Amino acid sequence: MSNGSIADLSGRDLDHAVHAEVMGGNVGDPDVPLYSTDWTDVWRVLDQAEAWRIHKPPAGDVVVQVLIGGKQGKHPAPTVEEAVCKAVLKARHS
């Protein structure tokens, strides 16, 4: 895995960042089930992972692996944004 920087943020901050990115809207707004195309949130989330890897094949789903708090999350998805969100959520709640 490529090393990402380690940010000193609490799990709650990370969950909020992921939630905002997953919902594509404001934190706490569950009525916006769209994925954000704002890479700021994606990189903010990856900065909080101890390690991460993005594999983007020529065809097929992007695969993202993250390591957070010693827990690994891996998820394939059509977009990098979606794969990052789901991999992080998987690591946070595994």
Which role fits each region the language model picked out?
Residues 3:
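Predominantly extracellular beta-rich ligand-binding scaffolds that present long acidic/polar faces
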Residues 79-88:
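A short, charged, amphipathic alpha-helix used as a generic interaction element across diverse proteins
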